[in-house]
């Protein structure tokens, strides 16, 4: 889920950047190059944030930070959802809504995984 949403945000960054470079009329109508360049940067940073946190969450070298990393990934995901609805201004699209659904599922899965990791390991059965 996290890799999928990272890919979506990097894709949106590329599409937005290409629009700024190749479609000056559409860029002007959408708020100008500065505004769209800012959004492209946000998309890139969001995608990169997901990738970095996924690596940190599952790489054995960072195992001692797993709980903190999981909460950071949950916070990034929640912030992404809030930012989408705050900035989209009612102009919803299938990619955005589909990605928000994936992000909600990601949060649920991360919480479930965190609860599972907190449970003590079952003692082996000896006879």
Language model features with spans:
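Membrane-interface extramembranous regions
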Residues: 1-127
């Amino acid at each position: 889920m996290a890799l999928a949403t990272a890919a979506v945000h990097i894709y949106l960054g590329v599409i937005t950047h290409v629009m700024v470079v190749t479609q000056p009329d559409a860029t002007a109508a959408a708020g100008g190059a500065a505004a769209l360049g800012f959004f492209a940067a946000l998309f890139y940073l969001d995608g990169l944030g997901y990738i970095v946190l996924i690596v940190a969450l599952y790489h054995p070298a960072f195992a001692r930070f797993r709980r903190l990393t999981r909460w950071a990934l949950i916070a990034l995901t929640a912030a992404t959802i809030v930012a989408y609805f705050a900035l989209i201004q009612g102009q919803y699209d299938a990619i955005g809504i589909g990605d928000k659904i994936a992000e909600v599922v990601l949060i649920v899965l991360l919480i479930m995984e965190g609860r599972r990791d907190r449970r003590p390991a079952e003692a082996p059965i000896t006879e």
